[in-house]
Regions:
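Short, hydrophobic alpha-helical packing/hinge segments within bilobed ligand-binding/sensory domains
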Residues: 81-83, 100-101, 188-192, 208, ...
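Bacterial N-terminal signal peptides
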Residues: 16-29
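Sec-exported extracytoplasmic/periplasmic mature domains
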Residues: 60, 87, 106, 169-173, ...
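Periplasmic-binding protein-like
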Residues: 119-128, 212-239, 251-254, 258, ...
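Secondary-structure end/capping motifs
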Residues: 242-329
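Short, glycine-/small- and polar/acidic-enriched structural segments
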Residues: 37-173, 179-183, 199-205, 220-222, ...
Length: 347
C-alpha cells in the first residue's frame, strides 16, 4: 500500500517539474532576441564612415538584438539620399550628417530628429580641408586660402558645404567667392582632388586617408579645429515614429553603444589618434569591418560622439538659420519643429 500511495505523488512531482521547465522555456522564448520571427525589424541608412561607429558596434555586438530588434544596415555614398530614403519608406532610421535636404524634408513634417551623433570637435579629426598637389604648390597652404578656389563637396547644402560656409564666416571672405562644385558623392570628390580637376575638397578623414598616404593630396586642416559644430544626427520618418516601442528600443541600443565607444575609444584618443591595445582593439576592429579600412587607419578617424546621445540643439538652430539665409533651406520653420522632443536629449 505504501508503494501504491507514493506513485501518484511521484508522478505529480514529475508533472510539476515538467510544467516548470516548460514555463521557463516559454519565458526564454518570449525574451528579446530569442526568436527571429518575434524581433521588430527595421532598416537603418548609414555611410561607411567612422562617424557611424556606434551603429556598427550595436549591430556587431548584438545590442540591437538584445533590445528585440532585427536591424538591416543599408549603406549610401552621400548623406542627403539617406533622408530621402527615410521619407520614401526605404529605410526606417537614418544616422548621418545634417544637410539642407534633411532639413527641408523635416520642415515639411516627413522626418524628425530623435538624437545626436557625430560632432566636429577640436582634437577629434572628422572632416578635413584637402588641397590638390598642384594647388598646394601654387600657394594653397591653409584653410583660409580657399577663397577664390574650386572646391569639391558632395552636394549643395551638405555638411561639407556648410563647413565651408562657416570657414568663410570665420575668415571674412564671401562663400560666393568660392567656386563650389557639388560632385554628388565622396568617391567622386576624392577622384576629382586626385585628378587635379579641383583645387580642394572637403572630405571625411576616412575617405581622404588613403589619398594622403599615397601622396595624392595635402591636408590643410580640420573642421573641428576651425569651426566646431553638431555634424550628425539620428532621425526617423513620422511613420516610424508612430511605432514607439521600435524607436525606444533602437535608441536604447544606440546609446549603449555611444557610451562604450566614448569610454573605450574616445577616452583614449591623444593627438587625434586612438591607441591599439587590448581594450580598444575589439571596437576598432568592428569599425574597420564596416568602413572597409584597416585598423591602423581607423585609429585616426575617431569622430567625437556624446556618450548619452545628446544633441546640441542650439547649434541645430544656428544651422537652420544659416542655411535659410543662404537659400538652401525653406523658410518658415525653426529647430523645434523638426525635433521629436519625446526622444531628443538636448545638450
Amino acid at each position: 500500500m505504501v508503494q501504491h500511495d507514493r506513485a501518484p505523488k511521484v508522478w505529480a512531482g514529475c508533472a510539476r517539474g515538467a510544467f516548470a521547465g516548460l514555463l521557463a522555456l516559454a519565458v526564454v522564448a518570449a525574451s528579446p532576441g530569442a526568436r527571429s520571427d518575434e524581433l521588430l525589424k527595421a532598416k537603418v541608412g548609414v555611410l561607411r564612415l567612422s562617424s557611424s561607429a556606434p551603429v556598427f558596434i550595436a549591430q556587431d555586438k548584438g545590442y540591437f538584438r538584445d533590445e528585440g530588434l532585427d536591424i538591416e544596415l543599408k549603406f549610401f555614398d552621400a548623406a542627403q539620399p539617406i533622408a530621402v530614403a527615410a521619407t520614401s519608406g526605404d529605410i526606417d532610421f537614418g544616422v548621418t550628417a545634417f544637410t539642407a535636404g534633411l532639413y527641408n524634408l523635416a520642415g515639411k513634417g516627413t522626418l524628425k530628429v530623435i538624437g545626436g551623433m557625430s560632432r566636429e570637435k577640436a582634437g577629434y579629426p572628422l572632416i578635413g580641408y584637402f588641397a590638390s598637389n598642384n594647388a598646394y604648390a601654387a600657394g594653397l597652404k591653409t584653410p583660409r586660402d580657399l577663397a577664390g578656389k574650386r572646391v569639391a563637396v558632395t552636394q549643395i547644402g551638405s555638411s561639407f558645404h556648410y563647413s565651408l560656409g562657416l570657414l568663410a564666416d570665420k575668415y571674412g571672405f564671401k562663400l560666393s567667392d568660392v567656386k563650389v562644385l557639388p560632385l554628388q558623392s565622396l568617391s567622386n570628390a576624392a577622384a576629382a582632388l586626385k585628378g587635379e580637376t579641383v583645387d580642394a575638397a572637403l572630405l571625411p578623414v576616412s575617405t581622404a586617408r588613403a589619398l594622403i598616404d599615397a601622396g595624392g593630396a595635402k591636408l590643410l586642416g580640420w573642421v573641428g579645429d576651425e569651426t566646431p559644430w553638431q555634424l550628425g544626427a539620428v532621425f526617423a520618418s513620422t511613420r516610424t515614429l508612430a511605432d514607439k516601442p521600435l524607436v525606444t528600443r533602437f535608441l536604447a541600443a544606440l546609446v549603449r553603444a555611444d557610451r562604450e565607444y566614448h569610454d573605450v575609444i574616445l577616452a583614449a584618443v591623444t593627438d587625434g589618434k586612438a591607441p591599439i591595445n587590448e581594450n580598444t582593439r575589439p571596437l576598432l576592429e568592428i569599425i574597420a569591418k564596416y568602413t572597409n579600412l584597416p585598423v591602423e587607419q581607423v585609429v585616426g578617424n575617431c569622430a567625437y560622439i556624446d556618450p548619452g546621445g545628446k544633441l546640441d540643439v542650439s547649434n541645430v538652430a544656428n544651422q537652420i538659420g544659416w542655411l535659410q539665409g543662404q537659400g538652401f533651406v525653406d523658410k518658415g520653420f525653426a529647430a523645434d519643429a523638426i525635433l521629436a522632443r519625446d526622444y531628443v536629449k538636448p545638450d
